Regions:
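Extended catalytic/binding region for NAD+/ADP-ribose chemistry, centered on the ART fold
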Residues: 47-85
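Short acidic, low-complexity intrinsically disordered linear motifs used
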Residues: 1-16
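Charged/polar, solvent-exposed surface patches and flexible loops
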Residues: 6, 10, 73-77, 113, ...
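Active-site and NAD+-binding cores of ADP-ribose-processing enzymes
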Residues: 17-52, 79-195
Length: 195
């Protein structure tokens, strides 16, 4: 433990509110310990207000976020190339009334029933959600927190829900963001974490 603390201290800048020169893994762990309950978005460019076009796909298009560092840890171990392209981590807040919240596999089934693209689903032999129809009821995103990882549909029709990697959400109209604070940024000498 003493060695870990000594190694961690070497990254402290003169400014005690900033950690500098961190690897992606170190940055992720630092945020995990200090921002565990926050909604964090990992991006390759600065956040700007925009609307992502939706269609009938397995997952919606948009700004994905996760609770704490769960997405960053998934990226670090499963999607290494994405971690190499990342440049910013934002803590975000938003108008929750604009988000469709799916807290269980059963709720995902109901959403699928209500917003299924029947033509595409029949051709693909799996349920495909028409995310554009969800935008038409005034929703600007969807959230899977908590995520029912153990849910599995016996007939494999809910593949889209099983493909959610971590407790997360997707915002396709970022104008609902009430907070977008950069909390980590990739610099020349590594990641800088602002506390």
């Amino acid at each position: 433990m003493k060695l870990i603390l000594e190694n961690f201290r070497q990254y402290l800048d003169a400014d005690e509110d900033t950690l500098t020169g961190l690897s992606f893994e170190e940055m992720s762990r630092a945020l995990g310990s200090s921002m565990g309950g926050a909604k964090l978005a990992l991006t390759d460019s600065p956040l700007q207000d925009r609307t992502y076009e939706q269609g009938s796909t397995m997952k919606p298009n948009g700004l994905w976020y996760a609770k704490g560092n769960s997405w960053m840890e998934f990226v670090r171990t499963e999607l290494v190339e994405m971690s190499e392209n990342a440049k910013y981590v934002y803590a975000i807040g938003f108008d929750k009334s604009k988000i469709l919240r799916i807290k269980s596999g059963r709720q995902a089934e109901r959403v699928t029933y209500m917003f299924k693209n029947h033509k595409l689903s029949q051709r693909a032999n799996v349920s495909i959600v028409d995310w554009d129809r969800i935008t038409k009821i005034g929703k600007a995103g969807v959230e899977f927190i908590p995520y029912d990882r153990g849910y599995f549909s016996a007939d494999y029709t809910m593949v889209w829900y099983s493909g959610i990697d971590v407790p997360s959400g997707c915002i396709w109209d970022t104008s609902i963001l009430t907070t977008k604070q950069i909390i980590a940024e990739l610099k020349e000498d590594g990641w800088e974490v602002y506390r």
